[in-house]
Amino acid sequence: MKNVHFLPWVGSKYNIGWQGKRLMIMGESHYCASLKDAVPSITHDIIADLFDADSEHEAYKNTYTKFMRSLTGHPLSNEEKREAWNRVLFYNFVQEPLTGPRKAPTAEQFRGSDTAFFEVLETFRPNCIIAWGKRLYDNLPRCGHQLNDVMAPDGKAIETWAYETRDGHAVQVLPIMHPSAAFSPDYWHEVIESFLSRQRNLKRTFTTYLHTSIRCL
C-alpha cells in the first residue's frame, strides 16, 4: 500500500468479522498539532488507546464510544470495547494531516487520497464500510454503484453505495451521522442493523438493491 500514509487499525479478529462480515469503519481525517505527530501508526495508536485501562479519559474518546454503542446496541465494558474493536478495521480517508481541529479537508486532499483508499479495499477486502459523516461520504470517489436506500426508524431514506475490487468483490458503504455532538446511538444502531442485514448474501444484494452504476476510470 505505497500510497497509504496513515495505516489502518486492523483488529486481531477482523477476518472473523462482525456478524461474519469484514467491517471497515471509516473516519475523515487526522488533526495533528505538529507534523511530527503525523506518523503512520497514529490510527492504530488512537484505537489501541481506547481500551487501555491505564490511559486517561480525553474528550475525543466520546466519539468512538458513541459509535461503538451504535454498532453493538449497548454500553460496553473496557474488555467488551477491546473485543469489539478487534473485530473491525478503522481507517481515516484523508492521507494528509489537518493543522486545525475544525478545518475541513480541501477537494485536492480528498481526491489525493482516492488511490490509497482503493489500495486499502484491495488489500483488506471489507464486505461493508460505515462512513462517518455526510461530508466524508459526499467526497468519496463517485465511481461504483448506487444501491437502494436503507430506511431509518423515522422513515428517512439513507443512500448507500458500493465499490468493486478488481476481481469483482463487492464493498458496500453506509454513511452515518458523524458520532460526535448530537448523535443518537440507538437511532443509528437500527440503521446499521438494517444495513448489515443486507450483507448476508452479497450477490443477491447487488442484483436486488442496485440502483445505478458509474464506471471507475
Walk through the language-model features, giving the residues of each.
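A structural signal for short, well-ordered beta-strand segments and their strand-loop junctions
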Residues: 24-26, 81-83, 87-92, 128-133, ...
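C-terminal capping/extension of enzyme domains
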Residues: 3, 104-115, 138-217
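Proline-aspartate-enriched helix->loop->beta-strand connector
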Residues: 117-134
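Active-site and ligand/interface coordination hotspots across diverse enzymes
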Residues: 1-62, 113, 161-164, 197-217
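Short, surface-exposed acidic-centric catalytic microdomains
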Residues: 36-104
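Short, solvent-exposed loop/turn segments at secondary-structure junctions
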Residues: 29-33, 94-98, 134-138, 178-182
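Extracellular/periplasmic catalytic domains that process cell-envelope and extracellular macromolecules
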Residues: 16-20, 82-83, 123, 166-169
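A Trp-anchored, charged/polar loop motif used as the substrate-binding/catalytic surface
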Residues: 2-15, 65-77, 109-119, 156-158
